[in-house]
């Protein structure tokens, strides 16, 4: 989404100013689908964010990717709104 790209652009700007910082991009999925499918989906989601940050000059060796699939929902509901909240990538400062 446009908002997601703007968030990543801001993160890239911050990371360029803080060149010693490394991050972990966590990929998440909603509850639908198998565990294996959602782990792969979460990984693709996190890798898409990584690729986007790299287009802004952030080195791949500063970015780790981790998928939680459907294991860590932010909304425990079982409806379209909850599912949309749970499909996400989260950036975590690693050091």
PLM features: residue spans?
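Structural recognition of beta-strand segments within beta-rich domains
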Residues: 16-17
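Periplasmic OmpA-like peptidoglycan-binding domain that tethers envelope proteins to the cell wall
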Residues: 28-95
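Short, solvent-exposed beta-strand/turn patches at coil↔beta or beta↔helix junctions
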Residues: 1-10, 30-35
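A conserved beta-turn-beta hairpin within the catalytic core of GNAT-like acetyltransferases
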Residues: 21
């Amino acid at each position: 989404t446009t908002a997601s790209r703007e968030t990543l652009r801001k993160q890239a700007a911050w990371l360029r100013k803080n060149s010693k910082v490394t991050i972990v991009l966590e990929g998440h999925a909603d509850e639908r689908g198998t565990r294996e499918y959602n782990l792969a989906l979460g990984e693709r989601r996190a890798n898409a964010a990584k690729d986007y940050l790299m287009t802004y000059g952030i080195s791949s060796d500063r970015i780790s990717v981790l998928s939680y699939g459907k294991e860590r929902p932010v909304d425990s509901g079982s409806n379209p709104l909850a599912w949309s909240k749970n499909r996400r990538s989260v950036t975590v400062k690693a050091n």
